[in-house]
A protein has these predicted regions:
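Short glycine/proline- and aromatic-enriched beta-strand/turn motifs that initiate or cap beta-hairpins
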Residues: 5-50, 162, 167-180
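Short loop/turn motifs that connect adjacent beta-strands in outer-membrane beta-barrel proteins
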Residues: 7-16, 50-62, 96-102, 138-144, ...
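Transmembrane beta-strands of outer-membrane beta-barrel proteins
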Residues: 17-21, 60-68, 103-109, 144-148, ...
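Transmembrane beta-strands of outer-membrane beta-barrel pores
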Residues: 23-29, 47, 68-74, 109-115, ...
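Gram-negative (and chloroplast) outer-membrane scaffold detector with strong preference
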Residues: 41-115
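Membrane-embedded beta-strands of outer-membrane beta-barrel proteins
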Residues: 43, 89-91, 131-133, 148, ...
Length: 180
């Protein structure tokens, strides 16, 4: 498909791979600890493991992905915590490509290790779960992604109390899809 940027990538295809560098940030929402901001940045590797399934607008491909998160910054009222994370559980539904757009839904989960308790008075070991809606904008060699992500951080009862942090984030990334 010819575009102003040249030919667009094919996007997510069965047997393909994704690599991406991303960064995101957001603020806490009701349902957990308030007055907290989050910034995180990471690297993703994904495997597109199915061909196209489902009818109509639901048609798409399933991708499994992992994220290394070397930069977590949690801005809390009492301090700023720095941490790292690993998300080994990334389930992504890549909807059928529409022109240069490749929309997706994602569910993911992992761990967060920080230098201060997150939230304050809880624990330095936490678990993360997230749901995201986004799209890839496919270019000739690379793609940009933009998404809205709901992120939940909790110690899962490792410490008391366990108020958790709920945030809505905007995440952007640059990456590439390819087939071996």
């Amino acid at each position: 498909m010819a575009t102003g940027l040249g030919l667009a990538q094919d996007g997510p295809e069965e047997g393909g791979h994704e690599v991406q560098v991303w960064a995101g940030g957001g603020h806490s929402v009701p349902g957990g600890t308030s007055r907290t901001g989050i910034f995180d940045a990471g690297l993703r590797y994904g495997w597109v493991i199915t061909g196209a399934h489902l009818p109509g607008i639901l048609r798409g491909r399933f991708e499994y992905a992992v994220d290394a998160v070397p930069a977590y910054v949690i801005f809390q009222p009492s301090n700023t915590a720095y941490g790292v994370g690993f998300n080994p559980f990334g389930l992504k539904w890549n909807f059928e490509r529409r022109g240069r757009l490749s929309p997706y839904l994602e569910l993911s989960g992992g761990t967060l290790f920080s230098d201060h308790n997150v939230p304050t008075y809880t624990n330095t070991v936490n678990f993360t779960s997230a749901a995201a809606l986004g799209t890839h904008v496919l270019g000739a060699k690379y793609n940009w992604s933009v998404e809205v992500r709901y992120l939940h951080i909790s110690n899962a009862g490792l410490a008391t109390p366990n108020p958790g942090i709920n945030t809505v984030q905007v995440r952007v990334g640059v990456g590439r899809f390819w087939k071996k």
